[in-house]
Amino acid sequence: MVLSAADKTNVKGVFAKIGGQAEALGGEALARMFAAYPPTKTYFPHFDLSPGSAQVKAHGKKVASALVEAANNIDDIAGALSKLSDLHAQKLRVDPVNFKLLGHCFLVVVAIHHPSVLTPEVHASLDKFLCAVATVLTAKYR
């Protein structure tokens, strides 16, 4: 998915506005994904998946950090997430659809906490960005 200059500006603007909340939003998005799509829990049998779990928050922080890294390197998302793509494809073997589910949950969390930021145009740009991230993370699945 090709991001236009306007998309890139919109995505960078979202991450600038959510700033220090990205980690909390990542944890909330992950918790929302587990609640809305219970089969995604199968990849985390060793986690305490209860609401507010420190393990879910910690993994949410990793998710948010990866999204921030991708946004900061929006012209080279594949390069920025190459190691993460290798990890998920070769070691963890996460079902690729889960990246799209998590992206959707992240959009929902941003909409809940920052409704004024998520105009229709920004929503579309952020959705395209999250789809691009999902595509990069699944590119090495073969």
UniProtKB/Swiss-Prot annotation:
<dbReference type="InterPro" id="IPR050056">
    <property type="entry name" value="Hemoglobin_oxygen_transport"/>
</dbReference>
<keyword id="KW-0408">Iron</keyword>
<keyword id="KW-0561">Oxygen transport</keyword>
<dbReference type="GO" id="GO:0042744">
    <property type="term" value="P:hydrogen peroxide catabolic process"/>
</dbReference>
<dbReference type="GO" id="GO:0005506">
    <property type="term" value="F:iron ion binding"/>
</dbReference>
<feature type="binding site" description="proximal binding residue">
    <location>
        <position position="88"/>
    </location>
    <ligand>
        <name>heme b</name>
    </ligand>
</feature>
<dbReference type="InterPro" id="IPR002338">
    <property type="entry name" value="Hemoglobin_a-typ"/>
</dbReference>
<dbReference type="InterPro" id="IPR009050">
    <property type="entry name" value="Globin-like_sf"/>
</dbReference>
<protein>
    <recommendedName>
        <fullName>Hemoglobin subunit alpha-A</fullName>
    </recommendedName>
</protein>
<comment type="subunit">
    <text>Heterotetramer of two alpha chains and two beta chains.</text>
</comment>
<dbReference type="GO" id="GO:0020037">
    <property type="term" value="F:heme binding"/>
</dbReference>
<dbReference type="InterPro" id="IPR002339">
    <property type="entry name" value="Hemoglobin_pi"/>
</dbReference>
<keyword id="KW-0813">Transport</keyword>
<dbReference type="GO" id="GO:0072562">
    <property type="term" value="C:blood microparticle"/>
</dbReference>
<dbReference type="GO" id="GO:0004601">
    <property type="term" value="F:peroxidase activity"/>
</dbReference>
<dbReference type="InterPro" id="IPR000971">
    <property type="entry name" value="Globin"/>
</dbReference>
<dbReference type="InterPro" id="IPR012292">
    <property type="entry name" value="Globin/Proto"/>
</dbReference>
<feature type="domain" description="Globin">
    <location>
        <begin position="2"/>
        <end position="142"/>
    </location>
</feature>
<dbReference type="GO" id="GO:0031720">
    <property type="term" value="F:haptoglobin binding"/>
</dbReference>
<dbReference type="GO" id="GO:0019825">
    <property type="term" value="F:oxygen binding"/>
</dbReference>
<dbReference type="Pfam" id="PF00042">
    <property type="entry name" value="Globin"/>
</dbReference>
<feature type="binding site">
    <location>
        <position position="59"/>
    </location>
    <ligand>
        <name>O2</name>
    </ligand>
</feature>
<keyword id="KW-0479">Metal-binding</keyword>
<comment type="similarity">
    <text>Belongs to the globin family.</text>
</comment>
<comment type="function">
    <text>Involved in oxygen transport from the lung to the various peripheral tissues.</text>
</comment>
<keyword id="KW-0349">Heme</keyword>
<dbReference type="GO" id="GO:0005833">
    <property type="term" value="C:hemoglobin complex"/>
</dbReference>
<dbReference type="GO" id="GO:0031838">
    <property type="term" value="C:haptoglobin-hemoglobin complex"/>
</dbReference>
<dbReference type="GO" id="GO:0043177">
    <property type="term" value="F:organic acid binding"/>
</dbReference>
<dbReference type="GO" id="GO:0005344">
    <property type="term" value="F:oxygen carrier activity"/>
</dbReference>
